[in-house]
Amino acid sequence: MNNTLSKRLCLTAMLTLAAVVYTTSAFAETSKLVIESGDSAQSRQEAAMEKEQWNDTRSLRQKVNTRAEKEWDKADAAFDNRDKCEQSANINAYWEPNTLRCLDRRTGRVITP
């Protein structure tokens, strides 16, 4: 009986020791903290690459913005022309929505109201 009791105590002690060692090793791994100034060669290189990419796409962004501006200006001008055409004193003038022009009913030619 003494033999089994000593085996149990030994086994319990070994399990406790293993648990303590495992727990402390886990804490040791998670408690590492590395503080960098953020001014490493790698971060400078990444920043330079990002800036270069931003500059490369700049002309594309400008083209997209210019195109959007042109489309808006065209729609705005067409809206104004439609209003002028519909309010025109010329009874033969009508607005053609497909071509966005004011046309003469008799001749089909463009009219400037």
Curated annotation (Swiss-Prot):
Q: Which InterPro entries match?
A: DUF1283 (IPR009700)
Q: Which family does it belong to?
A: Belongs to the UPF0482 family.
> Keywords in UniProt for this one?
Signal
Pfam families in the record: DUF1283
Answer whether the UniProt record assigns the keyword Signal to this protein: yes
The answer to whether keyword Zinc applies is no
The protein in question is named UPF0482 protein YnfB
Q: Which residues form the signal peptide?
A: 1-28
